[in-house]
């Protein structure tokens, strides 16, 4: 059986690279609810948690957990966009060093959000649809706050959790699960990690002049978050433009004159392709146009958007 308790610690470090932890086997059955301990080790006594997701046992309706840490809130569809939610869903954590327990139902696409000093603002659009906090929309009410989140899915057979540092890094989040299978932990980076990342970005910018420093967001002279290149490009489309062009020239030249073999480690086995007419073609499998630097940073545009090809 899956553990009924999972510890999530918002530490005083900075975020880690994405780490996925399988907290139970797919074959095991879970209870209808899960208790989660939120352990505050940020050093701040004013930390809030918000929990969102799609309620699997309630028609996949949008779910927020109310401030008492137990009561579900299902926002109704409002008549206009940007409507404030109708319930207090900011869960106050205790002082640094203390633990707050909450209980959730089965949720898909779940997120546990943490913010320091002030609660986050979640708005509701017709549908209903939740409007999440944004790190790229400068008019977003949360843009000047220190916040972060981890992701999870808890269904009738499994709990999956993910530190999810894909879009930005700010507050570090560590995950620990205890159960029949033992204890599993995804620790995040050590204390000072955000400052380390931001310092490295500033140094790289000084080295190559490519604008990596634009990924560092500060407030009052302190580092607030470090954005992914993709989110930096959202704010400045010229950022890192052409960064991989020299390397792409070499790759496209090399495989125009010789084949490329790829072990897919899947049903296709090892496939062989070659560049012809500027396109990397794997006969009978799929073809790929040359990516831009933005495509490479995002991995979900240009040739990486391959929903129409087998690969």
Model feature map: region roles:
Residues 31-311:
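Extracellular low-complexity, O-glycosylation-prone Ser/Thr/Pro/Gly-rich "stalks"
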Residues 6-26:
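N-terminal export signals
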């Amino acid at each position: 059986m899956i553990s009924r308790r999972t510890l999530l610690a918002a530490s005083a470090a900075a975020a880690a690279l994405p780490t996925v932890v399988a907290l139970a086997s797919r074959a095991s059955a879970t209870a209808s609810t899960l208790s989660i301990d939120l352990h505050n080790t940020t050093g701040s006594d004013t930390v809030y948690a918000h929990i969102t997701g799609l309620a699997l046992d309630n028609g996949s309706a949008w779910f927020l957990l109310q401030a008492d840490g137990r009561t579900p809130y299902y926002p109704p569809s409002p008549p206009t966009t940007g409507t404030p939610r109708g319930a207090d869903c900011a869960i106050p954590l205790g002082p640094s060093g203390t633990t707050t327990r909450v209980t959730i139902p089965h949720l898909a696409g779940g997120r546990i959000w943490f913010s320091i000093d002030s609660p986050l603002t979640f708005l509701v659009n017709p549908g209903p649809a939740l409007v999440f906090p944004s790190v790229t929309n400068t008019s977003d009410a949360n843009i000047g706050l220190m916040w972060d989140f981890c992701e999870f899915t808890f269904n009738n057979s499994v709990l999956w959790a993910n530190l999810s540092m894909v879009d930005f890094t700010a507050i570090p989040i560590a995950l620990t699960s205890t159960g029949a299978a033992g204890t599993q932990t995804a620790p995040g980076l050590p204390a000072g990690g955000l400052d380390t990342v931001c310092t490295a970005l500033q140094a790289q910018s000084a080295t190559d002049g490519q604008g990596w420093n634009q990924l560092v967001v500060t407030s009052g002279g302190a580092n607030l978050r470090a954005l992914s290149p993709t989110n930096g490009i959202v704010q400045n489309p010229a950022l890192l433009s052409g960064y991989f062009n020299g390397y792409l020239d070499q790759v496209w030249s090399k495989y125009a004159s010789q084949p490329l073999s790829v072990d897919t480690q899947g049903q296709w086995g090892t496939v062989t392709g070659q560049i012809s007419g500027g396109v990397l073609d794997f006969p009978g499998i799929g073809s790929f146009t040359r990516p831009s630097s933005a495509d490479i940073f995002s991995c979900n545009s240009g040739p990486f958007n391959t929903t129409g090809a087998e690969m």
